[in-house]
């Protein structure tokens, strides 16, 4: 049960609560990054070397994309690819990454970026550090329109404000994201097509796409 503290909060709740689905119902799920760095130190490497795969951290976020590798003291950029580390690896694919933690001073709680399969063609797999969350498809690989659609929803001010109303914490819990309302699958695809066509991704651009979709839906019901 949510209690809006302002008219803006009330509008946000009405807008997001009109969405009919959840991530699992759409065929996706958010999970927590696999590799806990202090438990896996023997497998982590600062340099690529032979037989290593990318290890992605929140520090690799660069706008809405991943910068890799980066120079970051104490944040090894590679994981050795061995039989023992198969449990820490993910197949290459399209993923939506979100930071698990933000500071109180930061404007956005939901900070996400796009990870494309073809970004890492030279590597057999990737890994994600435990301070990240990632959204993957439950069956098969996520398409680009699906990826852009989920990104636009989570990057919007509507979902960010909704999450703040729901939870005052600076931690983004995977279970909470999995229970949030999302547009229908067909709408996710429509949103994704428009987001992918944007000259430059932005929160305002994502908001505009969602608002246009809501306006079209309302007009359709009124006819």
Language-model features, listed with the residues they occupy:
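Polybasic, glycine- and aromatic-enriched phosphate-binding surface used to engage nucleic acids
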Residues: 4-199, 208-213
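Short amphipathic coiled-coil heptad-repeat segments
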Residues: 206-223
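Short arginine-rich
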Residues: 203
């Amino acid at each position: 049960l949510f209690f809006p503290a302002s008219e803006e909060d009330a509008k946000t709740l009405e807008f997001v609560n009109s969405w009919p689905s959840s991530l699992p119902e759409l065929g996706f799920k958010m999970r927590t990054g696999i590799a806990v760095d202090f438990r896996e130190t023997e497998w982590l490497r600062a340099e690529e070397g032979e037989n290593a795969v990318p290890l992605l951290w929140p520090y690799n976020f660069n706008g809405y994309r991943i910068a890799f590798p980066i120079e970051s003291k104490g944040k090894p950029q590679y994981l050795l690819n061995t039989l023992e580390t198969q449990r820490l690896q993910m197949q290459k694919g399209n993923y939506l990454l979100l930071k698990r933690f933000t500071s109180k001073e930061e404007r956005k709680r939901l900070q996400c970026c796009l990870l494309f399969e073809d970004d890492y063609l030279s590597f057999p797999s990737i890994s994600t550090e435990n301070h990240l969350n990632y959204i993957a498809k439950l069956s098969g690989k996520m398409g680009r329109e699906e990826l852009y659609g989920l990104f636009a929803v989570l990057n919007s001010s509507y979902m960010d404000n909704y999450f703040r109303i729901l939870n005052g914490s600076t931690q983004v819990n995977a279970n909470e994201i999995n229970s949030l309302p999302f547009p229908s699958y067909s709408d996710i695809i429509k949103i994704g097509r428009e987001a992918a066509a944007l000259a430059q991704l932005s929160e305002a651009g994502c908001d505009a796409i969602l608002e246009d979709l809501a306006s079209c839906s309302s007009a359709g019901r009124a006819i």
